[in-house]
């Protein structure tokens, strides 16, 4: 079920990328190279699942929101891989963007993908102006100096300051955008308030499992096995150990599922969220 659902989400988002970036240029090619690379599209899946809680948006708007969030995610991956950052040559099993297109073009492609996310939301004719403002406020906070960018800076600092809080780093680098995936299709403030802390914990669990897989199975992640070691990178596994990392992630997902089951009344939304959360723990890449 989860593979079919995420494949359907990925197909819709990929088509939106291709249709929106069909004007041929080196920049659009570089943008599509990372955006269309093999991936789980988990964030898009969460957008599609949570959209069913209220069922207030058109299909086009849901696809645009999902694409915007995946665009921000792709931008962050391109910039994270740069020589000045994590200096990774591989991403998703293929050469990183800066290896394929050069460092300068990769930087520009990342910049363009960030702008493209806001362009998608601003240009959506089905979304109300008030909802557009809420979405733009949410995703700009997620990817900005209080979100992913701050998390990346803390991640870089942690190479020389091992006492940095790994949970805070993961919450900023991963949790913030996953929170956006959970709440940007919604309008009800009580539902948003309920889902936000759950979403941030799910983001932490996702990144913990990434840390586990980078330790136990890096090739299946499509990354260089020596990358984190070379960069002296702080991870949940290096700080707490492999066994605690797995146990903590499983407990987070178990608690998240229980909270969702007690609150979410739409069976379709709940079942899809349950399988996505379980997939986070069970995934191998």
Predicted regions located by residue number:
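Generic C-terminal helix-cap and adjacent flexible tail
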Residues: 265, 282-285
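N-terminal amphipathic/basic leader segments beginning at the initiator methionine
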Residues: 1-17, 285
